[in-house]
Amino acid sequence: MKKLGIHVLILFIIFGCASTVEQLRTKNRENLLRLSLGMTKFDVLQIMGTETIESVNNPYRVETPKGKDGSLYEVLFYHTDKKKKGDLITDSELTPFVFKDNELIGWGWAFLSEVVPNYQYQIEVQ
């Protein structure tokens, strides 16, 4: 019985200290405040992180859409919000970070739609 108690305690310590997706979202929102325009992609990745928690990658995804000026942009999407219950992460729960020539030029859906007007993203309609 004593061994069982020790095993339960060890499991509690291991899983009690594990990061959750909610902690990841909170950390991403806090780290967002540390960013500034002109930072390199490397600097942003250092601040925002690149870990995977509960099968959620950070950044969640990376895309390279073509902008209205014909240039290719690199967009890193970070999980920052929770809009609905469940495990499915929707675009409305992500914040896009937009890079041109390895330099952060802006973030947010409004900014992305300015530089890539035809970008197709899915916002769930209620």
PLM regions: where:
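Sec-dependent bacterial lipoprotein signal peptides
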Residues: 1-17
